[in-house]
Amino acid sequence: MSTNRRRLVILVADSAGCGALPDAAAYGDEGSDTLGNTSRAVGGLSLPVLGRMGLGHVTAIQGVPPDPAPTAFHGRMAERSEGKDTTTGHWEMMGVVLREGLRTFPRGFPPEILEAFVRETGAPGVLGNTVASGTVIIQELGEEHQRTGKPIVYTSADSVFQVAAHTDTVPLETLYAWCRTARRILDPWRVARVIARPFVGTPGSYARTYDRKDFSMPPPAPTVLERLVEAGVPVVGVGKIPDIFDRRGITEEIHTAGNADGLARTAALLDRVDRGLVFVNLVDFDMLYGHRNDPAGYARALEELDRGLPAILDRLGPGELLALTADHGCDPTTPSTDHSREHVPLIVHAPGRGGGDLGTRATFADLGATVAEYFGVRSEVGTSFLAEVTR
């Protein structure tokens, strides 16, 4: 390992928002506060590491009071783009702000999309075509799917075309091929993501697997990731990061099977990588607990993150940075099972630098601007806070 290490780690706690944005009511999300409401629903959280880093300053979290002398810099970021989904949030982090929201289909997909999908994939038809919870719809339609071979197609409040299939009925590679075809069909419709949703099990006890795969629209403009790669800076995408950016601006991909695996792989990665950006998505918060309105599970996942952080923090030295944030909210305490329009936390660990208040940032793109300045590449969107965390 080189003694001249220069690494920046971004951990995205997927959906861990910290309070409704001013326009949240327009999205049906007034009062949402994923971290705060989760803490109160379970009678308090135990997050000693994150608490010392200053997480208690970003919103009122039961069990995590504001630390008077935090060890990291703390703040929160507001989303400037229209929307509240994974793609929009991650793209904005890396400097692409969407002025027009990506298209959603609250009444299902029109016949011309489904007819093209069936014709071009050779699938025997589709089931569903509705807004649904993925874990619910596979229980409702899984048996019919296995009997007919028809994939289950559904969407949500986000810009997604989701295709669920049992791995014994539709082999994984066939499902991926169908989703690649759907991606091509849906590009003109401005659908952010096509998501392959494989599942296993028997009627009444179907379960989704970690072999989900996202097929994203390419970002409409160059991201900070692409500029890093052009400048020769390695960019390692961990979890679903490569999928979100259509693999643009990624030099290495690491697949994960949940948050614990993602944290362990990130720590191991830091033992062999001495330069570049390590960009990590931890999806369990959103996939397993937020959408399922499970505050107890969400709380356990936050505590798991807290336990896993030291192994990563201990591998970073002077001049290196770690930023912990989120891409949107998904408050498990509200009636909705969809994402919520929220601020996201910003916790920045700069070894040897202590902590301080970064305030409320006007856009997620401030993070990308900071990454760009750290590695010496340009960015047009956002205001870097690098000087504030390295002074």
Curated annotation (Swiss-Prot):
Q: Name one GO biological process term.
A: 5-phosphoribose 1-diphosphate biosynthetic process
Keyword match Isomerase: yes
Q: Which reaction does it catalyse?
A: 2-deoxy-alpha-D-ribose 1-phosphate = 2-deoxy-D-ribose 5-phosphate; alpha-D-ribose 1-phosphate = D-ribose 5-phosphate
* UniProt keyword terms in alphabetical order: Cytoplasm, Isomerase, Manganese, Metal-binding
Per its UniProt record, the required cofactor names are:
Mn(2+)
Q: State how the cofactor is bound.
A: Binds 2 manganese ions.
Q: Superkingdom of this entry's organism?
A: Bacteria
Quote the Pfam families the UniProt record gives. Metalloenzyme
Q: Which HAMAP family match?
A: Phosphopentomut
Q: What is this protein called?
A: Phosphopentomutase
Q: Which organism is it from?
A: Anaeromyxobacter dehalogenans (strain 2CP-C)
Gene that encodes it? deoB
